[in-house]
Amino acid sequence: MANRNDSRNNRRNKDDIEDQLVAVNRITKVVKGGRRMRFAALVVVGDKKGRVGFGTGKAQEVPEAIRKAVEDGKKKMINVPKVGTTIPHEVIGHYGSGNILLKPAEAGSGVAAGGAVRIVMDMAGISDVTSKSLGSNTPINVVRATIDGLKKLRTSEEVSKLRQPERA
């Protein structure tokens, strides 16, 4: 009887994609009649097997904003190349004034990363990585810079294919 509420608390969908809330902001618009409140949600989605994305959503209520953000995140998913449980090489992701340095780590060392970067790595299924956040520390900038860094990753096969001259 202890697992009665599991279906409500489990955020795993039919297509095996999980989501995790990063931040919720309250937005206030001042109108003639007073203040109009809305909410903006930032969500990271992933299957923990190498696919990850993020989405934002705005609505009058928090649950609706989260739902919109999850839908947006599923549309913008990317594939992340992995070597075992880590990333193939060191990379720097940029977005605005936010920069994220991602370095591969030995197996078993864990995710050495702060808040938003840790969530992105967890959703991507990367369990051994070291990161350093430089510049902006706003959650949306950090998530976008991390995703940019993950987009830049290449496997050794892709790099060797690019280096080989074409033969006619």
From Swiss-Prot:
Source organism superkingdom: Bacteria
Location of the S5 DRBM domain: 17-80
For this record, an example GO cellular component is: small ribosomal subunit
Q: Which GO terms describe its molecular function?
A: rRNA binding; structural constituent of ribosome
Q: Does the keyword Zinc-finger apply?
A: no
Q: Which UniProt keywords apply?
A: Ribonucleoprotein, Ribosomal protein, RNA-binding, rRNA-binding
Q: Which GO terms describe its biological process?
A: translation
Function recorded in the entry: With S4 and S12 plays an important role in translational accuracy.
Per the record, the similarity remark reads: Belongs to the universal ribosomal protein uS5 family.
Report quaternary structure and partners: Part of the 30S ribosomal subunit. Contacts proteins S4 and S8.
Q: What is known of its domains?
A: The N-terminal domain interacts with the head of the 30S subunit; the C-terminal domain interacts with the body and contacts protein S4. The interaction surface between S4 and S5 is involved in control of translational fidelity.
Q: What is this protein called?
A: Small ribosomal subunit protein uS5
Chain's gene name: rpsE
